[in-house]
């Protein structure tokens, strides 16, 4: 028997079947670095329209976690897809390098500043620590396949950036937004510093819940207000609080002007409460026998005075809109030094902003004999005992409630009035302008807009000063007597900024005021405060984007971070940009959800359900991690587990196998010589290119809308359905058995070439390593990297006016699906082995029959059977299978007649009819020794 294997065009490629990504990716990365791929892309895109995604800086502390990976991969997908869309999209990664977590790490190792090291040496250690953290994180980000200017990232501790942060503050001061005040701010007693909103987390805490009676100073005046004369015992206004330790700072009681307040007689005394809360309060304090003597509106009680239970002074009743009927008594204990609402109303009434608590959370000397020097949280029990002793405690119970805690220490924080510097929200209309700017930004998902609007509408002034060592100095001089800013503040700040640009922030602490103030130095003091780190990162639109040459003066198009950044980086950036420039720093803001495990639980080391990106890359490869990120709808929580990653790996194999099939069948194809013109191609091949064109339209639209899970779904559908289960199956016969240089085969290769050129580009933003690998095996002249080009423009489709248009082939797909069902049943019944052992008769109604007949003898190639005939629907025998999908179709199957050709495996009647090739069929004889078969349709 002759060996006809050598006459077949068998697929061949060096592109490996297995990805072996974990082993292969590091080598590709080394090549990208050696070639300076990022630089090559920048050179290729120079002069094109820009798209700037500004990197929100991760904090330079610790290893990257799965959330970091999600963030950086999403950014990279956008930057790469924009590049393919014809944009110049430079990506400059950044790091947030100042602030408390780094100080704490350095303190753990070296002690607090001033103990073993001077403050200057401590700062140097902080800088050193941050630099090592940046290096560690950078390696992992690069390993993810993220392309960017990793050799020149921006660090908020770069001298130039530190100088520009000072300049940003100068601009805000120049625009009139800064003010100084003793305001209550979130204060961590462990950090001994004010905290930003974004540094506060809420945890459950158990506190004493108490009802306290403040006795009226003028009992008769109150009786008159309520129109009563017979009251048994003293009259008191009752407050409710869960922070007894704040009572020494009480300076008023707030009530609502429009609520009804009742005077209630209980045993031996009368109490004033909101009428709607009388029943619940009586229940709480265990009183069943009570009488309401009278009611008045809250407004009637304004400025009546009540005695503080133990501080020896009296306080007024004042009117406030913040009073609610949700809980308590309808009368709110008001301590302007310990709460923002209290502070605001205190300002209105000219109350003292008392702050009896020191930075370490203990009462200052002279507060109250039994409280001086006591930690405020330990003082709760002392205050309760004191109230009991004075007869002012109506009720006490333990209550669990959500309480603000320090994000770093996880310990409860306090509101504490301290002299601080604030960016005012309303002094110069910053709030109103910010709310206006929000409307001009595209928020993705769109609920982000309402979220940040409500935060901006309700937020207090921003306390930007911190009492820290490792941070950008505020660089201010204030008069030692008046505490007013120096009249030449802006000029002086620029002078400081110039020095910081050369020597870093240490230049401020080394600065002798005389050097820039001259004789005035004796009248002014240097402000020791540093800036909130959110000011550092929030000003990068100015300190980085405005000054980096690759951004060429363009503002950022997009900020992209986790959804917690509405109150973090998105907010601080908006505040600073609006305060500096009157406009938002971004055009689009995209947020992604947090990662959770397969059961939807938050990632936690204690539960042991964390997924380490380093482990995933070392086991499965970065492309699997990238595919998981792209496949997941990032607008909600993003579930990840070993099982979910395994599914991503399965999807990856499908895409890789499709790419490998294309490459293997492009063996020996030179696009410069072998390309077939569209009008000369086999119709099915043109249809396949048209499928790629339709897929590309959907995929590009999804990339444009940042719907990456749609990109992956469409890519998978194209690989699995249109290609895998239809086209790629059908063409194997023609591809392998036709004459190597025939139009029939070259037409097919032309289609595969166009499809591969498009597919490799669709993959590139997501499966960057694999796309680079595929690119290296594609035939034809090309640039070295897929990332320097644009979407493929060589696709074309069938015209609707053609008889065999897309609708024609869509119907054929359905017919083939129905035939496959019949073949599968026959295989299960052991009537046939493979589909080529079958011959089918399609009984079809006239319209469908005409379409099927149009394919002539080539219908069998579409159906992958050795025989296919078309007959009248009404002639179908009883055992023909009625199609469930196409009502006008029945399918009958019989065993194919003739012998099996050992070359093409088809069963035909003409095997051995040609003496010189006695073992093969007539079609194969033509392909081996004759002019070759002609194919028009399939």
Curated annotation (Swiss-Prot):
Q: Which GO terms describe its biological process?
A: isoleucyl-tRNA aminoacylation
Motif position, 'KMSKS' region? 602-606
State any single GO MF term: zinc ion binding
List positions binding ATP: 605
Record keywords = Acetylation, Aminoacyl-tRNA synthetase, ATP-binding, Cytoplasm, Ligase, Metal-binding, Nucleotide-binding, Protein biosynthesis, Zinc
A Pfam family found in this protein is: Anticodon_1
Name a single GO cellular component.
cytosol
Give me the comment on cofactor binding. Binds 1 zinc ion per subunit.
Q: Which residues bind Zn(2+)?
A: 901, 904, 921, 924
- The enzyme's main class, written as a single word, is ligase
Q: Which family does this protein fall into? A: Belongs to the class-I aminoacyl-tRNA synthetase family. IleS type 1 subfamily.
Quote the subunit structure annotation.
Monomer.
Q: What is this protein called?
A: Isoleucine--tRNA ligase
């Amino acid at each position: 028997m002759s060996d006809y294997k050598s006459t077949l065009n068998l697929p061949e490629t060096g592109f490996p079947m297995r990805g072996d990504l974990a082993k292969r990716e590091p080598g590709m990365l080394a090549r990208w670095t050696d070639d300076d791929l990022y630089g090559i892309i920048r050179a290729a895109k120079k002069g094109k329209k820009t798209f700037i995604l500004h990197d929100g800086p991760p904090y330079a502390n610790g290893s990257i976690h799965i959330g970091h990976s999600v963030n950086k991969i999403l950014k990279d997908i956008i930057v790469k897809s924009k590049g393919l869309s014809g944009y110049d999209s430079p990506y400059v990664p950044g790091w947030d390098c100042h602030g408390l977590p780094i100080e704490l790490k350095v303190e753990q190792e070296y002690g607090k500043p001033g103990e073993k090291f001077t403050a200057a040496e401590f700062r140097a250690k902080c800088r050193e620590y941050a630099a090592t953290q940046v290096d560690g994180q950078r390696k992992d980000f690069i390993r993810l396949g993220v392309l960017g200017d990793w050799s020149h990232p921006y660090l908020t501790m770069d001298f130039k950036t530190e100088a520009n942060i000072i300049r940003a503050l100068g601009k805000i001061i120049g625009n009139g937004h800064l003010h100084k005040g003793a305001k209550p701010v979130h204060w961590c007693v462990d950090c001994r510093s004010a905290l930003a909103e974004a540094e506060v987390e809420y945890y459950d805490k158990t506190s004493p819940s108490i009802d306290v009676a403040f006795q009226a100073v003028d009992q008769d005046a109150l009786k008159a207000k309520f129109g009563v004369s017979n009251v048994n015992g003293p009259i008191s206004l009752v407050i409710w609080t869960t922070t007894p330790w704040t009572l020494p700072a009480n300076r008023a009681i707030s009530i609502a002007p429009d609520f009804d307040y009742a005077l209630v007689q209980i045993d031996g005394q009368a109490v004033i409460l909101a009428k709607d809360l009388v029943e619940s309060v009586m229940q709480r304090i265990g009183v069943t026998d009570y009488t309401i003597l009278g009611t008045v509106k809250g407004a009637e009680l304004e400025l009546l005075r009540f005695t503080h239970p133990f501080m020896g002074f009296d306080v007024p009743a004042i009117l406030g809109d913040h009073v609610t009927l949700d809980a308590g008594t309808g009368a709110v204990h008001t301590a302007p030094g310990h709460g923002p609402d209290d502070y605001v109303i205190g300002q209105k009434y000219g109350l003292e902003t008392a702050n009896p608590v020191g930075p370490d959370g203990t009462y200052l000397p002279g507060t109250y004999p039994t409280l001086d020097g006591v930690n405020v949280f330990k003082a709760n029990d002392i205050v309760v005992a004191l109230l009991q002793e004075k007869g002012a405690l109506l009720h006490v119970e333990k209550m669990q409630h959500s309480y603000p805690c320090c994000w770093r220490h996880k310990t409860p924080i306090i509101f504490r009035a301290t002299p601080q510097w604030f960016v005012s929200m309303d002094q110069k209309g910053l709030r109103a302008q910010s709310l206006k700017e929000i409307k001009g930004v595209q928020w993705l998902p769109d609920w982000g807009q309402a979220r940040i609007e409500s935060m901006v509408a309700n937020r207090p002034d921003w306390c930007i000063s911190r009492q820290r060592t490792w941070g950008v100095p505020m660089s201010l001089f204030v008069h030692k007597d008046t505490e007013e800013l120096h009249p030449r503040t802006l000029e002086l700040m620029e002078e400081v900024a110039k020095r910081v640009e050369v020597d870093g922030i240490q230049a401020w602490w080394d600065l002798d005021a005389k050097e820039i103030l001259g004789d005035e130095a004796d009248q002014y003091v240097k402000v020791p405060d540093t800036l909130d780190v959110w000011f550092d990162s929030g000003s990068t639109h100015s300190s980085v984007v405005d000054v980096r040459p690759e951004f060429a003066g363009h503002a950022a198009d997009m900020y992209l971070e986790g959804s917690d950044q509405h109150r973090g980086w998105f907010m601080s950036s908006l505040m600073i940009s609006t305060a500096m420039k009157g406009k938002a720093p971004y055009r689009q803001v995209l947020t992604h959800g947090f990662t959770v495990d397969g059961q939807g639980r938050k990632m936690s080391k204690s539960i042991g359900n964390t997924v380490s990106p380093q482990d995933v890359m070392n086991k499965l490869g970065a492309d699997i991690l990238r595919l998981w990120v792209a496949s997941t709808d990032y607008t909600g929580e993003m579930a990840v587990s070993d099982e979910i990653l395994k599914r991503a790996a399965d999807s990856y194999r499908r895409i890789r196998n499709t790419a490998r099939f294309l490459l293997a069948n492009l063996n020996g194809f030179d696009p410069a010589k072998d390309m077939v013109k569209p009008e000369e191609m086999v119709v099915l091949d043109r249809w396949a290119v048209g499928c790629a064109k339709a897929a590309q339209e959907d995929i590009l639209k999804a990339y444009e809308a940042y719907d990456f899970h749609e990109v992956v779904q469409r890519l998978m559908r194209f690989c699995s359905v249109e290609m895998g289960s239809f086209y790629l199956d059908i063409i194997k016969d023609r591809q392998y058995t036709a004459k190597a240089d025939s139009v029939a085969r070259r037409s097919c290769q032309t289609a595969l070439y166009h499809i591969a050129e498009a597919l490799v580009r669709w993959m590139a933003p997501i499966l960057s390593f694999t796309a680079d690998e595929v690119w290296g095996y594609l035939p034809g002249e090309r640039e070295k990297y897929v990332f320097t080009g644009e979407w493929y423009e060589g696709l074309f489709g069938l015209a609707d006016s053609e008889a065999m248009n897309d609708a024609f082939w869509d119907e054929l797909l359905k017919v083939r699906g129905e035939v496959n069902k019949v073949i599968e049943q026959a295989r299960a019944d052991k009537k046939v082995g493979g589909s080529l052992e079958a011959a089918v008769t399609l009984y079809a109604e006239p319209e469908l029959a005409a379409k099927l007949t149009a394919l002539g003898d080539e219908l069998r190639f579409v159906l992958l059977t050795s025989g296919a005939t078309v007959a009248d629907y009404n002639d179908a025998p009883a055992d023909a299978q009625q199609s469930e999908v196409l009502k006008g179709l029945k399918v009958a199957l019989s065993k194919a007649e003739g012998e099996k050709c050992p070359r093409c495996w088809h069963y035909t009647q003409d095997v051995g009819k040609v003496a010189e090739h006695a073992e093969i069929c007539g079609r194969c004889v033509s392909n081996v020794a004759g002019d070759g078969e002609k194919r028009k349709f399939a």
